[in-house]
């Protein structure tokens, strides 16, 4: 390119010198001075516009050259020199035509291709003013040939067309607005890009679907589908076109910001959704998390039934209050049965948090976190007279075989505060056992009773499988002076506790907790024998002792009741000669 430009400049300087010499010789003869008035002169001008490569134009900048040639056609003595001059000019014009055609191709390619052609404020001009008429001896007019050439005019028109376009801040002439949307489109040839800016108000449940698609040579590269259902105000804002400058290249880059704002009465919810979902055939990971928090407030005359279904456990709490008289019924069938075989590991976890507030003068807070165990606390208040009933059949049965590992852990923490002048705090941490404490306040008379039916049965044999099922159904109806009816159907464990309060007199009834003990040797089971004990009625100032001894078993349960005004109840359990005091 540099060599061509230098060659053209050198030729123009030579021609200018020759024209100056010819002008001086013609002026000495007085032909040029008189010829200006005698002969009609034709002034033709041709505009050449060319463009260098983008790199060269940026490095050197634009330039403009203007040359004026004065030719006298009536000078017959200088025909040879003029003929040679025009032959050289014709040769030069042919090269300039080729050069300009090449430039036109480059311009068309850049406009259609990936590059962007910026219009130049300064054009490359070569102006030839021809003076005189026709040239003899068959010489052709180079200016006429160049005037008829489509290359120079085509480029000039092309510049005028590009100058008409709007390349400011990435905006084009085509702008459309529909439903509050502004669409800016920038064309760079075969590539096109779209920028959307939408703001809509959604009152009810509607679906908003926005697709930003970019087409590159007939292939869709980026397709974004957004489908959201909201009730409230939804606002989707994208950057407008004058803020983002789209660059065309082998890869197209989109910058998108999505903000979803949902307003629904008293709820302020902001969601930023970004999902990268990878589906593979190997190494799948699925995680589930669940948390429950329940808070209940009970008033007079309300009934509430709560059912929590977790893994292997069902807890139901029913509370009824009739005319200030409270009846509580708790029925809990709980089974943790695990059958393990060779090299099997099974672990269960369940967590529950409950907070209850009773408006009849007593407040109870119970928080139980247990694995495979259930803790229950019931409170009743009838005209200042309290009745507590706790019935918990619980079995933790472990069947271990060869190389089996099963671990159970249960922890419970209970804290109760009664407004009738008495506070009780119990914290029990045990494995496979359930600890319950009930407190009663009757006109300054306290009665405490603890009943723990707990069985930890482990059966380890070879190739033996033993399954246990326990189901309990309790139905109690307590009135002010009536008796209580209790029906319990339990397999492998029974625990009963009934309490009656009649006009300030305390009656405590404790039936027999049955224990079914299984011992198997080589797939043979022997069932133990149980004997029922006695039932004692205790008044509010008497002392009673109730002892039960079981035949065919190694367990001994000793229960002592002491009823006084401010005395505490002491209970002792001896299981397999291991004392446990609460």
From Swiss-Prot:
Compositional bias segments (type: Polar residues): 137-151, 174-192, 325-335, 385-395, 445-455, 466-477, 506-529
GO biological process, one term: negative regulation of flagellated sperm motility
Region Disordered, annotated ranges: 25-62, 131-156, 173-192, 272-477, 502-554
A single cellular component GO annotation: extracellular exosome
Basic and acidic residues bias locations: 50-59, 292-310, 336-345, 396-405, 456-465, 537-546
Pfam families according to UniProt: Semenogelin (PF05474)
Keywords: Repeat, Secreted, Signal
Compartment(s) where it occurs, according to its Swiss-Prot or TrEMBL record: Secreted
Extent of the signal sequence: 1-23
Primary localization class, coarse: secreted
Highest taxon above the source species: Eukaryota
Keyword Nucleotide-binding set for record: no
Complex and partners: Interacts with SERPINA5.
Protein family per UniProt: Belongs to the semenogelin family.
Function text: Participates in the formation of a gel matrix (sperm coagulum) entrapping the accessory gland secretions and ejaculated spermatozoa.
UniProt name for this protein: Semenogelin-2
Protein encoded by which gene: SEMG2
